[in-house]
């Protein structure tokens, strides 16, 4: 979701005002932030794999080591179709990493501006409560890859004698990752181990957000860096809603982070001016740099 910020926001506004609201706006949490109760090293590892999904050079270097992980398989060319990497990690298990927006690909950018709310895809619609809506573009990007990804994840689970499946991604990749996390939890034997999503935009309506909370709960870890504007789109007045419990890094790119309980917490990211560029969206998350196409390739674990 790193198409030129001003262009993206204008297109977002045009698409949204020309359509109907998904459903009335849901409530915001007023709970105070708390210390992050999770293993930070796992965030560092996951962020480095989210960055690697952007990398074209060496994309098929199977056996590539990043931290405690090994690259096993890749699909998608990163332009016409979003890239998805599968790694095996000592700390996270089988890791599915979704590429964020390729800013020089109109096909990738187009996913970010298809804001129309739609029903869940037929593959998994039966598992969702009535009234669930998700953003069309994010779902299209996800369903382009899902069948072959599921097939290979099951294959590598058997080969590695591994039951844990973790999902990571940044920006558009985080949105795909949220849909993927739910899909794995609902349809894959063994379900979801954990999800680490960075710079996550809103993906669905309150019915979706509530079902995410119910289904994967504190297995989901999503992170906002400083004044990043991407987590504020699509806008809430049009019915989109985040799931609970985001982690806010503030100041941006620092090692100061707190967890904000509940959905759409009024504290944290909503209290500071938004960075209209990408310096916070493409930043340092738990010491690993996520810089998109301009980030480290191959990715590096920590060190920032």
Curated annotation (Swiss-Prot):
Disulfide bonds join 55-297. CDD domains: Lipase_3. It comes from the Eukaryota. Its EC number is 3.1.1.-. Coiled coil: none annotated. GO terms for biological process: lipid catabolic process. Secreted lipase involved in Dandruff and seborrheic dermatitis (D/SD) probably via lipase-mediated breakdown of sebaceous lipids and release of irritating free fatty acids. Shows activity against monoglyceride and diglyceride substrates, but not triglyceride substrates and does not exhibit regio-selective production of diacylglycerols. Hydrolyzes distearin, dilinolein, dipalmitoylglycerol and dipalmitolein. Cleaves oleic acid from 1,2 isomers of diolein on both the 1 and the 2 position of the glycerol backbone, resulting mainly in free fatty acids but no monoolein is detected. PANTHER family: ALPHA/BETA-HYDROLASES SUPERFAMILY PROTEIN (PTHR45856), FUNGAL LIPASE-LIKE DOMAIN-CONTAINING PROTEIN (PTHR45856:SF24). This is Secreted mono- and diacylglycerol lipase MDL3. It comes from Malassezia globosa (strain ATCC MYA-4612 / CBS 7966). The gene is MDL3.
């Amino acid at each position: 979701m790193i198409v030129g910020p001003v262009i993206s926001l204008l297109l977002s506004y045009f698409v949204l005002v020309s359509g109907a609201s998904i459903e009335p706006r849901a409530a915001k949490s007023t709970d105070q932030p708390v210390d992050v109760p999770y293993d930070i090293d796992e965030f560092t590892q996951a962020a480095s794999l989210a960055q690697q999904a952007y990398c074209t050079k060496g994309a098929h270097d199977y056996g590539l080591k990043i931290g405690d992980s090994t690259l096993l398989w890749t699909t998608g060319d990163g332009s016409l179709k979003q890239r998805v990497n599968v790694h095996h990690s000592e700390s996270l298990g089988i890791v599915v990493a979704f590429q964020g927006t390729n800013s020089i690909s109109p096909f990738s950018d187009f996913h970010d501006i298809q804001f129309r709310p739609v029903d869940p895809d037929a593959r998994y619609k039966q598992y969702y409560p009535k009234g669930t809506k998700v953003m069309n573009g994010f779902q299209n990007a996800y369903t382009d890859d899902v069948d072959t990804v599921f097939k290979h994840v099951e294959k590598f689970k058997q080969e590695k004698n591994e039951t844990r499946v973790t999902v990571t991604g940044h920006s558009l990749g985080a949105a795909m990752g949220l849909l993927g996390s739910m899909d794995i939890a609902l349809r894959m034997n063994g379900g979801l181990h954990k999800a680490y999503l960075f710079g996550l935009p809103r993906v669905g309506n309150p019915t979706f957000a509530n079902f995410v909370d119910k289904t994967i709960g504190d297995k989901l870890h999503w992170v906002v860096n400083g004044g990043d504007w991407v987590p504020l789109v699509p806008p809430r007045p049009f019915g989109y809603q985040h799931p609970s419990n985001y982690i806010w890094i503030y100041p941006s790119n620092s090692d100061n982070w707190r967890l904000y309980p509940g959905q759409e917490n009024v504290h944290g990211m909503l209290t500071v001016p938004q960075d209209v560029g990408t310096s916070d969206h493409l930043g340092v998350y738990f010491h690993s740099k996520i810089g998109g196409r301009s980030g480290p390739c191959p990715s590096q674990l920590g060190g920032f």
